[in-house]
């Protein structure tokens, strides 16, 4: 198959006056990212973000990647070596490719800006607490900018849901006295049928490389505690390997790192109880842009609500953040899913409940046994093929 060729990025203005960084793609639609004109000073002049953004599409379709403009030499080296090995461990059907650039250059000096993504979820609040609102954080580590990226996490709700979620979180940023930067993009259109969780690390890393003119350190909340850091299952959530992936996506001018692995998901959730920002918690995966609360029935809502209920703190979040009725209707089925799960965060939640005398019920245990048997049968059948 022919190479995936991206031209040197250039800047333009969209109809709202935002600054759009565009890389034309041979035979395809351009790749673009945009920020407000007030944030233009953060934009870097290199094409590192293009190389990071397009590596996975190139590997999936077995197309060597040619990037116009300047790419940092150390990043280009890792894109051709260890990063591809890591990606192919998670996605064995992806191919080794050659990544080249029109020009390479050593990294310059690291800018002083420190950014973290802020979505209003449990994990992003944990990072915010540790590196923005806590006392005694060294200046070199203290967050100076909050980011909210539109890189495909909002499902069918798309740009409308992204904007609504961003606007809802503005008061938190204002209270902390931090600039809150929305970064729009069409990167999702370059990842057809590739899955968001399967590619999330590279999507968000592309954004911080885009902002390399002002950001020299970027935090990305881990998905669990250190004991759960591991290579994901085949075609699984690549974010589970964040502690391994992010260092390979760094350069001497930009440190990209995974944070908050010292806390379990349960500890991060309970840290919000009684806090000033609890009412802003948004964990929901429902893509309806018109929703006014968390849906209280998706797996993320169920996990968070059960954690709070076991701790005796759910009432603090109802009805402003969650709604009790949908949760209670689905609770027994969710218990069965938890009890039969091998996912580390689910196992931790079951252990937390059992330590606190939580009663799962005979019906849920029976359904869990049936689910495990069905899963075992599928695995045996797959092994015999």
Regions found by a protein language model. Give the residues of each.
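N-terminal, positively charged, Ser/Thr/Ala/Gly-biased leader segments
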Residues: 25-44
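Extended acidic/polar, glycine-enriched regions
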Residues: 40-55
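Nucleotide-activated chemistry modules centered on ATP-dependent adenylation/adenylyltransferase
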Residues: 1-9, 14-24, 53, 58-65, ...
